[in-house]
Amino acid sequence: MSLFEFTDRVGRVSPSATLAICNEASALESQGVDVVDLSVGEPDFDTPENVKRAAHDALDAGKTGYTPSPGIPALREAIAEKLRADGLDHDAEDVMVTPGGKQALYEVFQTLIGEGDEVALIDPAWVSYEAMTKLAGGSLTRVDTTPYGFHLEGALDDLQAAVSDDTDLLVVNSPGNPHGMVYTDAALEGVRDLAVDHDTTVVSDELYQQIVHDGREMTSLGSLSGMGDRTITLNGFSKAYAMTGWRLGYFAGPAELVSEAGKVHGHSVSCATNFVQHAGVEALRNTDEAVAEMAAAFERRRDTLVAELADRGVDVPAPEGAFYLMLPVAEDDQAWCETAIGEAHVATVPGSAFGTPGYARLSYANSTERLLEAFDRLEAHDLLTAGV
């Protein structure tokens, strides 16, 4: 019998599936097992050298104390400049700097979602959207894009049927985790029309904005007419700049929202790490070439994987951005993933964790050699074509 009485809200939430698989892979590796880890959403590149130097310089200059809670002025202004370049009308006062993108999402949900409030998700959806909704006391309505190859445009009628005047928040993620699709302007305009018609606030998670394939350009939802005052834009430094462990993210929206969210921020994390924020300024201002090189490498891997899977009898929708691929697997995707890691020693994440059973998410943030090794192992255990 437990000594503790846990809250209902925590009881509604399951541990992160992505972190659970990552921990299992690490445990096997500690026993000497060679695991090809395709579960983790982490670039396999090092942080750009100039960003690391900026952090060192900030440390040497004594930038180790508290900062203003919303972030240092230089970083907030650099973020605002980036957002304005994306077509959003934001000043530095509209920006909250957070220790990671998850914290940004948490603060927004805690500020906007109360007991019983409705949040609409577009499946497959990143695992933490559901958890953040439940932690805030909200309820979920979900729209599945799987029948449309994970493209939102085909699912707009379904989304229209799901979103109503009772929908308090709609979450849009493009390029998407776990599917890698980049939503078209027509799809985003459809979201805009629904949001305006139902007076619904939209969270636009743009964490993978700079990792797009085939020369695509991603439209920021908040730049569309009618969306500036009803969109909260989330972004961060983990993926594009290979800064996962630095824990630096941000959100931007109407000043009133940022001010209210500041209460959650101030009473939970106080501020993001001082010297890391200075490194963030350097990342925004002087890493275009490094970011482009990483994005190009991800695109080459995408091309190799999609072609290799086709050669082995598996057709998959080609990801348009980010660095994830949804592989069709057995109906019981969780059992498939357990077999994959337990027998083939390949770590993946079950699609059911994202609201899409029958699939496994593979991250191609790994070397081409290791990715092909993973396919060989899965094929040797009759797992690669299990969902065909």
Question: Could you tell me what each predicted segment is?
Answer:
Residues 67-71:
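Short beta-strand to alpha-helix junction loop
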Residues 63, 74, 350:
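Short coil/turn motifs at helix boundaries and re-entrant loops, enriched in small/polar
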Residues 47-66, 80:
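Glycine-rich phosphate-binding segment of PLP-dependent enzymes
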Residues 75-79:
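Conserved AMP-binding/adenylate-forming core of the ANL superfamily
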Residues 34-41, 57-62:
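Glycine-/proline-rich flexible loop or hinge segments
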Residues 10:
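Substrate/cofactor-recognition hotspot
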Residues 3-6, 14-16, 21, 28-35, ...:
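PLP-dependent class I/II
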